Amino acid sequence: MATELVQLSADDFEDAMDFMNLVFSASSPTNFPQLLPALYQPNDEMMGWNWAVRESGRIHAVVGSFPIEWQLGEIRIEMSGIGGVSSHLRRRGAGYMRQLMNHCVERMHDEGKHLSWLGGQRQRYAYFGYEKCGVGHTFNLSKTNLRHAYGDTTSHLSFEPLDATDLTHRAGCIELHDAQPYHCQRTAERFDFQLRSWKNRPYVALAPDGRMVGYLVANSSGDSVTE
């Protein structure tokens, strides 16, 4: 059976999303354009981050290699994030994932990427040079914590949802984000998509006079702040 490894384009958006949604929904209902709008849009640039194996023209496996520019003070780190790794159930064991992963890792070396990251099963991705690293911090804060730390002090800040059409406050969020010594470089449009990925919800913090003084990104249930 004829197979080919191809770079996807905007023309492949619907077929690729249908395929990936089908594969991932076998374990949990998944809609990639809704879940990760920062990565999946029907244009050539973003779809070109995805590579696929086709059999007789039909997609049977996909791996995404997504560019990330990480600013560390005055140093810029070029990264690639691996995601959307999927193989059709009837083609498990055919070697398509290995073929695509090897291709993406080889391209990273050719393009001079400094590092790559992914989330997934440790042993599965160890074959391609990935290993656990780094430290993540999670802070838990309750009303009781606040009462003991600040007493009955009342905050005069208010939080309003950031509307996708609110370009003024979006620009303010980007300015605050880019002022951090460590941050990712993002276009304005992709910045908004990033805030809303993983079903998260962005909010702007407003002073009593209406001035924007900050922003945060909460998860869909509103009980965790991710940014």
Where are each of the predicted segments found?
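Conserved active-site alpha-helix within GNAT-family acetyltransferase domains
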Residues: 110-114, 119-138
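Conserved acetyl-CoA-binding loop-helix of GNAT-fold acetyltransferases
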Residues: 84-87, 93-106
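Conserved beta-strand in the GNAT
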Residues: 50-52, 58-68, 79-86, 211-226
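Amide-forming acyltransferase catalytic core, primarily the GNAT-like/NAT-type
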Residues: 136-227
